[in-house]
UniProtKB/Swiss-Prot annotation:
This is Pre-mRNA-splicing factor PRP21. InterPro entries: SF3A1, SF3A1_dom, Surp, SWAP/Surp_sf. It holds the Pfam family PRP21_like_P. Residues 246-261, 269-280 have a biased composition (Basic and acidic residues). The gene is PRP21. PANTHER family: SPLICEOSOME ASSOCIATED PROTEIN 114/SWAP SPLICING FACTOR-RELATED, SPLICING FACTOR 3A SUBUNIT 1. Gene3D superfamilies: 6.10.250.1320, Surp module. GO terms for biological process: mRNA cis splicing, via spliceosome; mRNA splicing, via spliceosome; U2-type prespliceosome assembly. Keywords: mRNA processing, mRNA splicing, Nucleus, Repeat, Spliceosome. Belongs to the CWC complex (or CEF1-associated complex), a spliceosome sub-complex reminiscent of a late-stage spliceosome composed of the U2, U5 and U6 snRNAs and at least BUD13, BUD31, BRR2, CDC40, CEF1, CLF1, CUS1, CWC2, CWC15, CWC21, CWC22, CWC23, CWC24, CWC25, CWC27, ECM2, HSH155, IST3, ISY1, LEA1, MSL1, NTC20, PRP8, PRP9, PRP11, PRP19, PRP21, PRP22, PRP45, PRP46, SLU7, SMB1, SMD1, SMD2, SMD3, SMX2, SMX3, SNT309, SNU114, SPP2, SYF1, SYF2, RSE1 and YJU2. GO terms for cellular component: catalytic step 2 spliceosome; nucleus; Prp19 complex; spliceosomal complex; U2 snRNP; U2-type prespliceosome. Changing residue 168 to A: In SPP91-1; corrects the PRP9-1 growth defect through partial restoration of splicing and by a complete reversion of the pre-mRNA escape phenotype.
Amino acid sequence: MEPEDTQLKEDIKTTVNYIKQHGVEFENKLLEDERFSFIKKDDPLHEYYTKLMNEPTDTVSGEDNDRKSEREIARPPDFLFSQYDTGISRRDMEVIKLTARYYAKDKSIVEQMISKDGEARLNFMNSSHPLHKTFTDFVAQYKRVYSFTGQEIKKSKRTILDNCFERTQYWEFEKDKDREHDKLVELCKIQFAAIPWDKFTQVAKFSIPEDTEIFEGSLDLEQMRLRRVQTGIKLFDSIKPTNEEEKIVSDQGKQKGGDSKGKKRKIRAVGETRLKKSKK
């Protein structure tokens, strides 16, 4: 019985492709997962699963190959008349739009008004003003509107419809890419879960001499890290003072000062020297 759900059908086809690539062990691993119940014989979808397993690989993956062979759809240009800063107050936006409209029609009118009255509210016309880009964008939009005639607008209806169709195609293409990415992530999780982590393979052997009595311990990564840090600290010991002569002079001064302090001096009481002289 073929499933009615399109997404479920795609999941079964993708699972079949992976099982054909990785063998029966992959199928046995998926039996433990309830999401792949169609692998079990008592499941209603097992017949459809078996049918796909018996089909050639090219037939099963034909739709995927056709999807991958589709050409890349170029990103459509941004909307010209709806891309502007939305963080501007309504009053300021009206002033900018009205000024841009007059400027696109005849910029001399606006320039005369600025030179005559020195209107401070039109500072956004200066290139250093934060709203200058918004002003120039609206000027370009109004110039584009004024450049079209009635006949050209009638002729451009077909172009507008074609652009809308291409934009819709691009959006659908982006949605398909997102779905493919999500499906790939899910399959990677399935493949990771199917790895027999409880089974190991012997890669190599190493022998220890029989006369060995003391075995070296395993590497202590923490000690290795500390050892490197200590080695780096020793680099500071080799740095000499910026002024070696000043250091030598200061060391000599300290030594002399230490000698003078080291001599013992006898401090006499007040008038003791005078009394000794009078006795003589």
